[in-house]
């Protein structure tokens, strides 16, 4: 019996509470997995993306939020010629995109000890939140009063 791991289909989406286009996500899952990242749920409407970008400085990384997509790009500019006997720290250029659900916004980005952390918050407008509607009509007390008057 075969088992399929669908976790790559879910890991680049944040705040979605519904299924999305699996074909598009499957294509994204086959792409390069650099840099490694985590997506954490910090609360009901709070999320955090952490990317391991060791070897990059904050001015070599750009974070762009446009519509429902967060794009993180890194370009290492090594101006000095150095001779490495072994190079294990990757400094290649990268571009990583994350699709966000409606009303999820980037609140903050911070860089500390080689980790880029991007804080996200889902803020649903008041007009879009569910609300309870009062039903107007005859209550059972009013109905009994009307019946006793009729009798």
From Swiss-Prot:
It comes from Bradyrhizobium diazoefficiens (strain JCM 10833 / BCRC 13528 / IAM 13628 / NBRC 14792 / USDA 110). Signal peptide: none annotated. Residues 28-138 form the sHSP domain. It comes from the Bacteria. This is Small heat shock protein HspD. InterPro entries: A-crystallin/Hsp20_dom (IPR002068), ACD_IbpA/B (IPR037913), HSP20-like_chaperone (IPR008978). SUPFAM superfamilies: HSP20-like chaperones (SSF49764). GO terms for cellular component: cytoplasm. Belongs to the small heat shock protein (HSP20) family. Keywords: Stress response. Gene3D superfamilies: 2.60.40.790. PANTHER family: PTHR47062, SMALL HEAT SHOCK PROTEIN IBPA.
